């Protein structure tokens, strides 16, 4: 079992590169959205590119990686950048984004078969001035 370079791949600012970390029919659950389920590289690439376009200078820093004996990898990360593109319900205000999250990944060899992504939406909205 290998650990994908989540930080470097997201920081490449390419949705297609992000999707290449997954198996062909890989699944990404974005639990905080609520339970947005993306299946397949095309869906994952589109969603990733949408986020990259909203925060075009984004960088993902990895804080900790833990490998389980059962083929599970847990990654604690920080998504940072400047919110300079509009998204539905999240108008651009050029504010700093500093979002801490955790990904729990079921691996198939060196690729992610299924990922469950958790982050604190309230922190994101407060930073955007949308939550008091």
Language model feature labels by segment:
Residues 1-132:
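C-terminal and inter-domain tail/linker signature
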């Amino acid at each position: 079992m290998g650990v994908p370079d989540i930080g470097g791949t997201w920081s490449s600012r390419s949705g297609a590169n992000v999707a290449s970390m997954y198996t062909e029919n890989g699944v990404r659950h974005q639990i905080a959205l609520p339970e947005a389920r993306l299946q397949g590289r095309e869906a994952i690439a589109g969603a990733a590119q949408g986020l990259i376009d909203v925060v075009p200078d984004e960088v993902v820093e990895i804080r900790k990686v833990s490998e389980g004996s059962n083929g599970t990898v847990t990654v604690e990360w920080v998504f940072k950048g400047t919110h300079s593109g509009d998204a539905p319900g999240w108008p651009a205000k050029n504010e700093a984004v500093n979002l801490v999250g955790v990904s729990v990944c079921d691996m198939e060899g060196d690729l992610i078969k299924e990922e469950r992504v958790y982050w604190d939406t309230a922190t994101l909205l407060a930073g955007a001035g949308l939550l008091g």
